[in-house]
Amino acid sequence: ILPYHRIVKDIKGMEPKAFIGSMKFNFELMAMPGFPCKPVEKHCFGLYVDGEWFHLKAYPDIYAGKDSVGQLDVSILQDKVLGPVLGISDPRTDERIRFMGGNHRLKDLAAAADETGGAAFAMYPTSMEELMTIADEGKLMPPKSTWFEPKLRSGLFIHKLSD
C-alpha cells in the first residue's frame, strides 16, 4: 500500500505565511528548506507551498479518542485542514483538489502545486492493519485513502475471516 497524496489548486486566497500559520493549531510545524518532506511515520505530513517544504506532525489530542476512521491520516487532514481551512468539504467532487499516487516522486508533487500556485500534501501510507481493522468493523475508508501497486486486475482484495 502506497500513500495517496493531495494537491490543492489554491489556498483560498490566503497569503502562504497565513496558510502555514493556520497549521500551528493542530500540528507541530518544522520548515524543511531545500528538502522534499516525505513523512516517515503515522500522523505526519509533508506540506509544500510557495516553493517550500514543511514537516507537519499532528498533535495527539486531535486524534486521541477518535474511532479507527477518524485516526487515519487522510481523515485528520480532511478534518483539520482541507475542510475548515481550505473549504473543501467533499474531496470526491471538489474541483480544487486532485490526487497523486504514491508511485510519483515528491518533486512531481511539488511541480503540480507550483502549476496552480496551490499546495501539496505528502501523505504517509495507510497500513494494512488500519485497512483490515476498518473492514472488520464494517466501516468505509475515506475517499482516496490508499494507492495499491501493482494494480490488481480484479480490483478485489480478499480478507480471510477464519482459519
Where are these regions (language model features)?
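Surface-exposed, charge/polar-rich loops and edge strands
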Residues: 1-163
